[in-house]
Regions:
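Acidic/aromatic/glycine-rich contiguous surface patches that form carbohydrate-binding/processing clefts
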Residues: 456
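Conserved short loop/turn motifs at secondary-structure junctions
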Residues: 91, 312-318, 815
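Active-site groove signature of glycoside hydrolases
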Residues: 306-312
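Activation on extended, non-transmembrane soluble regions of large proteins
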Residues: 20, 26, 38, 82, ...
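Carbohydrate-interacting/catalytic domains
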Residues: 1-46, 58, 63, 71, ...
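Hydrophobic or amphipathic alpha-helical targeting/insertion segments
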Residues: 73-121
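Surface-exposed, active-site-proximal loop segments in enzymatic domains
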Residues: 48-61, 99, 103
């Protein structure tokens, strides 16, 4: 297996192509990267900036450079001994435009499309209006309104010989069985003759070739005679006249789709979406033919040696993640002699392990991002900050309360259709037994709701219809929550649902007196019973996962603001901090179970850049100070609040009412965000710089307000409230405030900036030296003060980074830490060590090291050992109090460490060590102690190796 030493995540799109990346390969190599880790490379919706809306799995994106461009990039990578890992998206496809041939085919032919089973469509909807149809919630207003306004119209694509319903940029193919009536409507002999080609046509697959021949004739007819005749036919379906509009409506009603207002999606959509996004349709990759079709391109590229590994997007969306990973591993292994490198995007809950029976190399690193992020937080700040949040906002101090409320809201308002579908699956099971046939759909829906809202992780992974012991750990928690919430009368149904969802083996349905009912002749349960249970289990799992993502990450994390540095993808804001011992335990477990898992601290999906989080984490160390600052700023900026509903604006700083904009919660979160993302070198009198920052923060603010779904949301935006929030932001950052709030904000950031930078360097070295494969998100080798997308996907100035790359020890840049070169140097130096001694930081033992002395709690240390080679990593932590008010460097004055020392392994007591990051060569004394005043005398972090290892 080609195991990466380190990866660099690059976001490809038409503004940054494969050829653009190829220009910087020399820089990537010099930085120490072994593999470029590419965003999805398959053809996506036109203009896609992320690639996760695939429309053609078989082609490399032409906008990104096509297959030729990809191979040029790979040739450049190979010339520098580098490889390529690609992101694959097997869970869903983009269906929001007119570029997805598979999707257009099912709209054209319905259940008889060759791709009808490629997508997760419920063709047997209980709604007669949707039976055999696909709901298309794409209209900007009600269907009747859009039809009357003429925005829905019949069109003809001359180059394809196809009739279609057009709506804006959308194309909805008309079934060829209707072509004859359309052509005959013009009452022209030439069109009547063409109509004969379509008479008697059915939707059966055997008739599809005949339809294709008819379309060819239509295309030839128009090419030879022009489009005038077809225009006559189209006029008979014009929306401008009531009669022809009714004909158009009846034509649309006969199609295999139902056009609907976009607001209907949450309640009525009859196909699986990616989360609640109605432009992304779930793909049934569990079907062998779909699996092969989806992976044909990556399999070929892997077999050809173009690609070295795969990242699997949203593995929890799949029907069978375990089986998928097993099949993927088997197929890749068949294609090449070397073992493939495969990682999965899997969000792990608190204490949840990645399953051992998944043949993958690990996760994409959100679990490490959570661990190292929590390590930066002082547990002493948890309660006072929660209390401050509750007092200022009137909201709960517990994240769990916000998460539970958000789960209920998401189920009721965003994923109601998905909940109904899962409940119907349970209801079908209930109807198969005399003992459960009286469980109503409403009862089962109520029971299912409580299980889902209390489910603590993304999902379960049943095997052969039964949950595993690991599954039961989390299912029991959901059961307990459901029992507390449900009326006792529903507990019987709850226990049966528990059994159906994998809690017990299948039993023959029992009738009165325990006599089995509805058995086959050999006494077994009905043959469909097992299938029905597995369907219900799949639908349950494909419901809990999006509910967790949308409710926790995309709702509660925007409502709860104790400290925003913990509100991150893959994190639990209720888990405020992690001890050194817990961090070591996680590293040890990873080194033993998934030593090649990715280690991330920034991603294309993060809510705040890694250095934003590192700076905000400092507030946990100064909780009382921050609480006072929040109150002071709230009072200072009270005059800039905006009135809502003509009510007077409070001038009181601590006003927990929500009659004003932005409101207490949004205001408190805004201050944290400004503190976190304020650039280190930005001055309050820099009008252009402050305005640029304000625009970026305003973009974040709008998204945050809508995601919170409190006073505005994506479904029904309150534009007046949003505008008032924006005005408040620009008012408090206006140039005339440079001697007021702006000055205070800048001064506060300057006061905690060194501690934030120290946290950043600690986080950086831990990612680079911990067990696993360090992943670098594009551009974050310098300070990363980005916010949520699209801010974290801005163009990267690689030329600047390349110009700043040097062989100079990081300690030389510490005095100018504001520009970020010290971070760049740390990344380069530690990755160079990985290149010099690849086994030492990848396949080695992980040994936590004890620290003693006055400030032992302010240090983390561990050793990596491979054979006779050693590396010792030491880093300052929770150092805001030790830094003090004086000084310019993000490091503790060496003398302040006093008697604090690392207890070194006996094997290192007599060896000469030097710091890989500075000229220092600290000594281990005769008692095996390494004093921090020596180890951290030049930098807040150290990577100690034996003398004799080349420094460059």
């Amino acid at each position: 297996m080609t195991v990466p030493r380190s990866t660099l995540r690059l976001q490809f799109h038409r503004g940054f192509t494969f050829d653009d990346a190829a220009k910087h390969v020399e820089y990537f190599a010099a930085l120490g990267i072994s593999h470029v880790y590419a965003s999805p490379i398959t053809t996506a919706e036109p203009g896609s900036m992320h690639g996760y809306d695939t429309v053609d799995y078989t082609q490399v994106s032409a906008e990104c450079g096509g297959e030729a461009g990809l191979k040029r990039l790979v040739d450049k990578l190979r010339a520098h001994d580098m490889g390529l890992i690609i992101d694959t998206v097997p869970n869903h496809m983009g269906v929001g435009g007119s570029s997805n041939a598979w999707w257009l085919d099912i709209l054209e032919w319905g259940r008889h499309s060759a791709y009808a089973r490629h997508f997760d469509v419920d063709w047997h909807s209980p709604d007669p209006a949707l039976r055999g149809k696909v709901l298309l919630p794409t209209l900007g207003a009600s269907y009747g309104e859009e039809l009357a306004a003429g925005r829905i119209a019949l069109h003809f694509a001359a180059d394809l010989g196809r009739f279609y319903i057009g709506y804006g940029p959308h194309v909805f193919p008309v079934c060829p069985t209707d072509y004859a009536s359309i052509l005959q409507s013009a009452d022209r002999s030439d069109l009547n003759a063409l109509a004969e080609r379509f008479h008697g046509l059915t939707t059966q697959p055997t008739d599809h070739p005949r339809a294709a021949e008819g379309r060819d004739m239509l295309r030839e007819f128009v090419a030879q005679n022009g489009g005038t005749a077809i225009e006559f036919a189209l006029e008979t379906y014009s929306s401008g006249d009531p009669v022809t509009r009714d004909r158009l409506h009846r034509l649309i009603e006969r199609q295999h789709f139902r056009l609907a207002w976009w607001r209907t999606a949450s309640d009525e959509v009859n196909w699986r979406r990616f989360f609640d996004i109605s432009t992304l349709a779930g793909v049934r990759v569990e079907r062998p033919e779909v699996f092969e079709a989806v992976h044909a391109l990556p399999f070929r590229l892997y077999q050809e040696g173009v690609v070295d590994g795969l990242r699997i997007d949203h593995v929890d969306g799949l029907a069978e993640p375990r089986e998928y990973c097993q099949r993927l591993r088997q197929r890749l292994t068949e294609l090449r002699d070397t073992a493939p490198y495969v990682v999965v995007e899997k969000i792990l809950g608190r204490g949840e392990p990645l399953r051992d029976d998944w043949p993958v190399d690990g996760t994409t690193g959100y679990d490490f991002m959570n661990d190292v992020g929590a390590l930066l937080h002082d547990p002493a700040g948890a309660e006072p900050l929660a209390q401050t949040w509750a007092e200022l906002t009137g909201r709960s101090p517990r994240f769990a309360d916000e998460a539970l409320a958000a789960r209920r809201k998401i189920l009721a308002e965003n994923l109601s259709a998905e909940l109904d579908r899962a409940a119907r699956a349970l209801h079908r099971i209930a109807r198969d037994s005399l003992s459960t046939r009286d469980f109503t759909f409403t009862t089962l829906r109520r029971v299912l709701t409580e299980l889902v809202v209390h489910f603590p992780v993304y999902r379960i992974y049943p095997q052969n219809g039964l949950r595993s012991t690991a599954d039961n750990v989390y299912f029991e928690q959901a059961l307990e929550g459901a029992r507390r919430s449900l009326a006792r009368a529903d507990h019987v149904a709850l226990e049966r649902v528990n059994a159906w969802l994998g809690g017990s083996a299948e039993e023959a349905p029992a009738g009165r007196g325990g006599v089995p009912q509805q058995q086959s002749p050999n006494g077994a349960p009905p043959s469909h019973a097992g299938s029905a249970r597995r369907t219900a289990q799949t639908l349950f799992s494909q419901l809990t996962a999006p509910v967790a993502a949308k409710a926790v990450e995309d709702t509660a994390c925007y409502r709860y603001g104790r400290l925003l540095s913990r509100n991150e993808v893959g994190a639990d804001p209720g888990e405020f901090s992690l001890s050194v011992e817990q961090f070591h335990a996680s590293n040890l477990e990873r080194s033993q179970r998934f030593p090649h898992a990715m280690l991330a601290t920034a991603t294309h999906d993060h809510k705040r850049g890694e250095d934003v989080r590192a700076r905000i984490a400092v507030l946990s160390e100064i909780a009382q100070d921050w609480s006072a600052t929040l109150r002071a700023w709230s009072t200072l900026n009270a005059p800039h609040r905006r009135a809502l509903d003509s009510k007077p604006v409070s001038s009181v700083g601590q006003d927990t009412s929500y009659d004003w904009a932005p409101g207490p919660a949004a205001e408190a979160m805004l201050y944290q965000t400004l503190v976190g993302c304020w650039p280190p070198d930005l001055q309050p009198d820099d009008e252009a710089g402050v305005k640029e920052l304000a625009e970026r923060v305003a973009q974040w603010q709008l998204k945050a307000l809508r995601e919170a779904k409190l006073q505005t949301n994506w479904l029904a935006p309150d534009e007046a409230y949003e505008a008032a929030c924006r005005e408040f932001l620009f008012d408090i950052l206006a140039p005339q405030r440079r001697d007021g709030f702006l000055k205070e904000l800048s001064a506060f950031v300057a006061r905690i900036g060194r501690a934030g930078a120290l946290n950043s360097l600690q986080q950086t070295v831990l990612r680079l030296a911990s067990p696993g494969i360090p992943d670098l998100y594009q551009g974050t080798e310098l300070w990363d003060f980005s916010l949520v997308d699209p801010d974290n996907r801005r163009p990267v100035d690689f030329a600047k980074r390349e110009a700043w790359l040097a062989q100079t020890p990081p300690s030389e840049f510490l005095s100018s830490w504001h520009d970020g070169r010290v971070k760049l140097a740390v990344v380069q130096r530690v990755l160079a060590l990985r290149a010099h001694l690849p086994e030492l930081l990848s396949h080695s033992e992980y040994l936590p090291l004890a620290v003693r002395g006055k400030h032992a709690s302010n240090v983390i240390a561990f050793a990596r050992r491979h054979g006779n080679a050693w590396a010792v990593v030491v880093a300052s932590r929770l150092a805001a109090g030790l830094l003090g008010e004086k000084g310019d460097l993000p490091m503790v004055d060496p003398e302040k460490w006093e008697n604090t020392a690392v207890e070194m392994p006996p094997d290192l007591s007599a060896r000469a060590l030097f710091d890989w990051l500075s000229p220092a060569a600290p000594k281990v004394d005769e008692n095996g102690l390494l004093y921090l005043r020596d180890a951290l005398g030049a930098m807040p972090i150290a990577v100690l190796v034996e003398d004799g290892v080349p420094r460059s």
